[in-house]
């Protein structure tokens, strides 16, 4: 198993399990490849983070204030601004994982966000917790390959 801790990027969207951005610290045997938050040896930079991101876009409508999302697709969250309120919200991005993934998460925020997420991807099960907003945040993840 690998443990990862990340700061930066879209950490605030912790509702999207297993996705982090920034610096990551891994504690694992040197030969083991990555989970959802880092790409092994001792320290790695992320988005090596998304070897198989644990989550997806929400089939439900995206709200600018809060949302509950559940997905089974291969997408990782990205951020976009909603013109009406200029608030970042999570949207589906191009696929970056070859493995099927499933995720369950809740996020809330207007200009910033906080959330909690649980994700599973065939190649890398992961747990993710995040706080923060667009351009900054803190995320904690665990996964194994």
UniProtKB/Swiss-Prot annotation:
It comes from the Eukaryota. Sequence repeats lie at residues 27-30, 33-37, 39-42, 86-89, 92-95, 98-101, 123-126. This is Cuticle protein 65. It comes from Locusta migratoria. The keyword Repeat applies. The keyword Repeat applies. Component of the cuticle of migratory locust which contains more than 100 different structural proteins. One of its GO terms (molecular function) is structural constituent of cuticle. The tetrapeptide (A-A-P-[AV]) repeats found throughout the protein are also present in many proteins constituting the protective envelope of other species. Keywords: Cuticle, Repeat.
